[in-house]
């Protein structure tokens, strides 16, 4: 069993983009930014507990941070992890909450 404290730290934010909106409409999939060390099992448990929905599958990827320049210095943005969470048929997550 995964501790509740850990589940609250797994999901960082929903990832809203043009691609994630299209995927959500077509395949009932929601996209989240998650902790870089989060596993698929932790992500599945966190979404199921926090949003009270049934999760069908989880796919993850790590986006590598881009190299950026500020003045003469070269820096690098942090790597971050993204999770595509497919919900069971009939399940839905409402991020807006009551807005019509």
From Swiss-Prot:
The keyword RNA-binding applies. Keywords: Ribonucleoprotein, Ribosomal protein, RNA-binding, rRNA-binding. One of its GO terms (biological process) is translation. It comes from the Bacteria. SUPFAM superfamilies: Ribosomal proteins S24e, L23 and L15e (SSF54189). Gene3D superfamilies: 3.30.70.330. GO terms for molecular function: rRNA binding; structural constituent of ribosome. Part of the 50S ribosomal subunit. Contacts protein L29, and trigger factor when it is bound to the ribosome. Belongs to the universal ribosomal protein uL23 family. One of the early assembly proteins it binds 23S rRNA. One of the proteins that surrounds the polypeptide exit tunnel on the outside of the ribosome. Forms the main docking site for trigger factor binding to the ribosome. This is Large ribosomal subunit protein uL23. It comes from Shewanella denitrificans (strain OS217 / ATCC BAA-1090 / DSM 15013). The lineage of its organism: Bacteria, Pseudomonadati, Pseudomonadota, Gammaproteobacteria, Alteromonadales.
């Amino acid at each position: 069993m995964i501790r509740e404290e850990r589940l609250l730290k797994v999901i960082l934010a929903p990832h809203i983009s043009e691609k994630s909106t299209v995927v959500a409409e077509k395949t009932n999939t929601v996209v989240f930014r998650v902790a870089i060390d989060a596993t698929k099992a932790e992500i599945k448990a966190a979404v199921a507990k926090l949003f009270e929905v049934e999760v069908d599958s989880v796919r993850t990827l790590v986006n590598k941070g881009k190299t950026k320049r500020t003045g003469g210095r070269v820096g690098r943005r942090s790597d971050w992890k993204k999770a595509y969470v497919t919900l069971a048929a009939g399940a839905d997550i409402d991020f807006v909450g009551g807005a019509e």
